[in-house]
């Protein structure tokens, strides 16, 4: 289910392309839920800027896939189907996992908090009925910025940081994980 980093497109995505990609992801999610009446993990990489498919985002994605599969194995949860693809919004993974949706969401939240690359992952859990379990459902604060302790959304809206600084931080986190062989 991994993606080859060397095949990244480096396409600068437009806002309309991004919106279409998100609509297509939602349609894929609903199709998966019809095939598998178990919770669905929909996984993407948080990638600032217009280039969503790069060697870096694919490598970050691959670490996330490995971590999600290890989480399922550790918990004894069966992955019924899994797939990886690339859309205009970057690498995307979907895993149908036979587990209680609430337990799955809590475990993925813990994964996002404990893994060194967790801040770069956006892991959604959808119930078999198609409801997205949100961080807010668990009284969790919004995601933090990669460079400061502000809300990531506030920094993004205000363009608080230079894109190059954010991308450099992403790459530094990835290189640290690769150097330590963290999965």
UniProtKB/Swiss-Prot annotation:
Q: What is its EC number?
A: 2.7.7.61
Catalysed reaction per UniProt? apo-[citrate lyase ACP] + 2'-(5''-triphospho-alpha-D-ribosyl)-3'-dephospho-CoA = holo-[citrate lyase ACP] + diphosphate
Q: What this chain does, per the record?
A: Transfers 2-(5''-triphosphoribosyl)-3'-dephosphocoenzyme-A on a serine residue to the apo-acyl carrier protein (gamma chain) of the citrate lyase to yield holo-acyl carrier protein.
What name does UniProt use for this protein?
Answer: Probable apo-citrate lyase phosphoribosyl-dephospho-CoA transferase
Q: Give the family this protein belongs to, as stated in its UniProt record.
A: Belongs to the CitX family.
Coiled coil spans: none
Keywords in alphabetical order: Nucleotidyltransferase, Transferase
GO MF: holo-citrate lyase synthase activity
- Could you tell me the Gene Ontology terms of the biological process aspect for this record? prosthetic group biosynthetic process
Q: Which HAMAP family match?
A: CitX (MF_00398)
UniProt KW Transferase keyword: yes
Task: Specify whether Nucleotidyltransferase is a keyword of the entry.
Answer: yes
């Amino acid at each position: 289910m991994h993606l080859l980093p060397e095949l990244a497109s480096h396409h600068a995505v437009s806002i309309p392309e991004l919106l279409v990609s998100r609509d297509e992801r939602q349609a894929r999610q609903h199709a998966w839920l019809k095939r598998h009446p178990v919770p669905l993990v929909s996984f993407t990489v948080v990638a600032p800027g217009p280039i969503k498919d790069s060697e870096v985002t694919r490598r970050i994605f691959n670490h996330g896939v490995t971590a999600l599969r290890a989480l399922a194995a550790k918990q004894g949860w069966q992955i019924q189907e899994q797939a990886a693809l690339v859309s205009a919004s970057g690498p995307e993974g979907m895993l149908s996992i036979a587990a209680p949706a609430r337990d799955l969401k809590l475990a993925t939240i813990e994964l996002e908090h404990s893994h060194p690359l967790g801040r770069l992952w956006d892991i959604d859990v959808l119930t078999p009925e198609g409801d997205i379990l949100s961080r807010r459902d668990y009284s969790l604060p919004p995601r933090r910025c990669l460079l400061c302790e502000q809300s990531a959304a506030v920094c993004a809206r205000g363009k608080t940081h230079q894109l190059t600084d954010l991308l450099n931080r992403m790459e530094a986190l990835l290189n640290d994980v690769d150097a330590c062989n963290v999965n």
